Amino acid sequence: MPRIAHDRRLADHASAWVRSFDCSHLSILIVCRGPIRKEAIDVFREMGVAKVGMLLSEKDSVVYPRALAPDVRIMPPERIHPVPDYTGATKAERVERVAQICAIAHEHGYTHVFAGYGFMSEDADFVRSLEKAGLIFIGPSSRVVEAAGAKDEAKRTALQVDVSVTPGVDDLTSRALFAKHGSVAGMVAAAGALGVSADVDGAEHLDAAERLLQASYAAGVDLLTIDEIAAQAQTEVDALLADLPGKRLRLKAIGGGGGKGQRILSAGDDAASLYREILSEVKATGVGDNKNVLVELNVEETRHNEIQLIGNGTWTVSMGGRDCSLQMHEQKLLEVSITQPMLTAAAAARRAAGDEAMAAALETECTLVARMEAEGERFGEAVGLNSASTFECIVDGDRHYFMEVNTRIQVEHRVSELCAILRFRNPDNPEEHFDVDSVVEVMGLLAAHGPRLPRPELAPRHMASLEARLNATDDSLSPHAGGEISEWSAPIEGEVRDDQGICLPNPDTGDFVPYRLAGAYDSNVALLLTVGADRQASYEHLAEVLRRTELTGHDLSTNIGFHYGLVHWFLGTDVHARPTTRFVSAYLVLVARLARAAEKIDLDTAYDALLKAP
């Protein structure tokens, strides 16, 4: 069975060098929800962290029908801190919530804050507020979040370090400011009238515009109206579409994630209106907010690949890749590990079996992954990455384009950690080392000891891994909010289940306690993972996990049947098939047609025909 829960304490290690990386002195406040909250509680406790507390939103499922919710049961009452919600609905509420989190941390003696993969986790203002309050964020610093997390800044950095990027415009607001005033002197004068200044000596006109805009954000002043930027968006979109006949474009907010803040448009679409929609969706309409949006070529038939990065500010290391192309409504559903060792072994096996074409395709895939990993490491070092982040790319054939960096832990981080171990070795005595097999764990280590941690080696763990997101959805994979889980079978051998603690039994009776899904934030219920000696084995194991999972309840609808069918499609076709991000939609259409055809079949007649078949 994959080693997930185990003793991670370093305080009692025989080596003084290893002991120096002990984390038991940390005091951590967890400010997120979902499976990552329970995972973080477990990992930090396994690391020996003496004090772990959590926020609890009023929107969370606080009570079972007949018992306390698992998050509440596993935490001492004095370490549960109620809040109205985790982020606030407006900028003012967000500022209020951040101040509340800082106050809770100071009042209760927390030194570190962990935000999982919620919106707060890559909010530079939130991280900066923690830093100013003397708290340590378990994640990238505000400097890194700004440099890597803002999609426009990240794209400029990518170009500087020879990373492939999609064609388009990354400086919409700079262009709008110059178009409004027509000269550097005009921009400087207009900004000065609003109390904004910046050093623009020797800067070209768009660079000068960007410097003035950055100064305006710091001052909380708008140099442009939303209407002015929207008009510039329409101008840029029209120009790009004229140069790219027949193509579509993607408007993408510089912040956001999970598909939020993005719109695809074609010739004739109202780019200005779509721009306004995006700003509203990512809550960037306030005075002083950075309202820049990327305008990029939309690569239609794409795969979505990403690289797991870890860094300490000096070095950056890749833990391998993930294929996240199997998605719907911009939400990932099934994530697959893609690593150089696995692809190399798979290519050799196919060649030995006489399948030269697939062997060559797998070798090409391996080369592609190697390029993405190298680019990810260069990018991480360029921005001084000092925690965990994900380098995301779109893949078109054997080419890839940098898409964005998520400066946080991802939902699917376990897909990578199940395939790799980070081995930290004493540079003065190579025989002394310690291993880390958890992204959450290494984030804690980096927050406590980052500059001292030597660049780790990558040691093999499992050759392949898969993650299925078990969501509360209807048959179209649209969210099905609410519902109650009354029974859930125990995990089978080798199954890794991150279920928010839902399956924790009643400590007195050992019985399953019915759980009411809140449905206030997203539809995810749990993450189901498996590993294998190769991709085929990991798919076969996941198929067995799904087959044996018994999940019942009232008004409960999940995508477990979808996953069971999808996994068997790959097992019956080829586990190394490379679906695009459009695959799931087409798959659902074909499944619906098959279901309608099956309704017309007389099962008794079909069974008799099978018995008579030679």
Features from the language model and the residues they span:
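Generic hydrophobic alpha-helical segments
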Residues: R97-I101, A233-L240, G376
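ATP-dependent carboxylate activation and anion-phosphoryl transfer catalytic cores
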Residues: M1-K38, D42-E46, P82, A92, ...
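Glycine-/small-residue-rich beta-strand-loop submotif within the FAD-binding core of flavoenzymes
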Residues: Y86, R211, V411
